[in-house]
Amino acid sequence: MARTLQEWLDYIEQQHPKSIELGLERTREAAERLSLGKPAAHVITVGGTNGKGSTVAFIEAIAHAAGLKVGTYTSPHLLRYNERVRIEGREASDEELVAAFEAVEAARSSPSPIGRGVGVRVRRSGDSPAVGQKPSSPNPVSSTGQAPPLEGEGSDIPLTYFEFGTLAALWLFQQSNLDLVVLEVGLGGRLDAVNIVDPDVAVITTVDIDHVDWLGNDRESIGFEKAGIARAWKPLVLGERDSPSSVLRHAYAIGANAVRLGSDFIHEPVDESHWRWRDAGFEIELPNPKLSAPVQRANAATAIAALRALDIELPSSAFAAGIASATLPGRLQRFDLHGTPVIVDVGHNPQAARELSAWLRAEPVPGRTLAVFAALADKDVQGVVAALEGEVSDWFLASLESVGTRGQSADELASKVSGAAAAGSRHADVRAALQAARAQAHAEDRILVFGSFHTVAEALAILHSGQ
């Protein structure tokens, strides 16, 4: 009997002993078996600590408004796995995802190439460049870290949940005859599964401290990992003014063309409802993004720079239409819960918390801001709380244990923070914390729910149900 999408997801979760295992060898080998080529005529890969999802959303919306056929791959999802794969403005259907998972599973367990589409060989150490190819230029399926043959090559390939999903998305894109595919990095960049694909343009939105167990505990180390998505002789768009020197050194070392916010392109305010984007050869006045945080202008500007770097003609009207229409769930998303305003945001590190704090200051309410906060155990929760200290009056700490070993209880969370947050009430889950905050909210108050994608997902399930 054929598996449903949920049965496939349950199966995939059990196929690798670790939820995260960085490295490209397994994914490359499976891609070779699937005969995966370049997933679209043009590819943009987007990495960074914060702003990846928003930047992808802006790129997709602008390209769609220009009439391009676009596919996007993002993670994690909030309510449905289908959110991760979008094709021509819609989420992939259950049936499409099931077909893709079936193809990946067949390839994973078969040593022979079985996929359809353009077959490409994964170039390994000692291979000669393709005809007409510069010696340092990678193939569509990447050679960024010359991979030795896998131990036991030809046998079943163990894939993590993310690797399996990445291959499924690439398989779907290859079937869809797309003009542009936009890939969001899952973790880091250099060893992330999406990095088997060579982009025409790479983007690094921001670099800040997060995922220290995997990427390092300072911006230079983390920047080095993220810079691994850059390619020789290709544009690397940098969405912040003070990128770590490790990013710039890597770009210089491989011959990537760094396109930097603040020097190669800028954004500047025009009036309360408009702003201007410009580079050396192009200038356009645009409406404020529908995504409302101040940082979204930088994300939108970075998206425009990425599309400009593709060197394809786009009508000016598409930029304005895309900026004005791009949306993304879980980013300062507003709800009304029985008369109380509720804002949900996936921010989960100090940099994101600083941006969130700036937005709260810019959008004051007459009453209090009550915060429902739950976070994964490996996050800098004290740094997050410190960034919001002046904007939140009451804290409702929630346990986040349904996600397994990465979660933590409200008591554990309270032990890692100080001040008003440490003295906040503690609750069994996000639902209980949100209900408690709603019970204490007065007419002029608002509730902020934040701390992780899991926190927001639990809140959205409640808010969409109207409970």
Task: Indicate residue ranges for each PLM-predicted region.
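ATP-dependent carboxylate-amine ligase catalytic core
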Residues: 4-8, 18-41, 64-113, 124-140, ...
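Beta-strand->loop->alpha-helix junctions that form or flank phosphate-binding loops
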Residues: 73-76, 238-240, 252-270, 289-293, ...
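Active-site-proximal loop/hinge segments that shape catalytic or ion-binding/gating pockets
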Residues: 452
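Hydrophobic positions on the alpha1 helix immediately C-terminal to the Walker A/P-loop
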Residues: 54-58
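Hydrophobic anchor at the beta1->P-loop junction of P-loop NTPases
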Residues: 44-46
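C-terminal helical cap/extension that packs against the catalytic core
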Residues: 237, 241-259, 270-274, 308, ...
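Nucleotide phosphate-binding/pyrophosphate-handling subdomain across enzymes
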Residues: 42, 180-185, 192-203, 207-211, ...
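Acidic, Mg2+-coordinating active-site environments of NTP-dependent enzymes
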Residues: 110-111, 135, 140, 154, ...
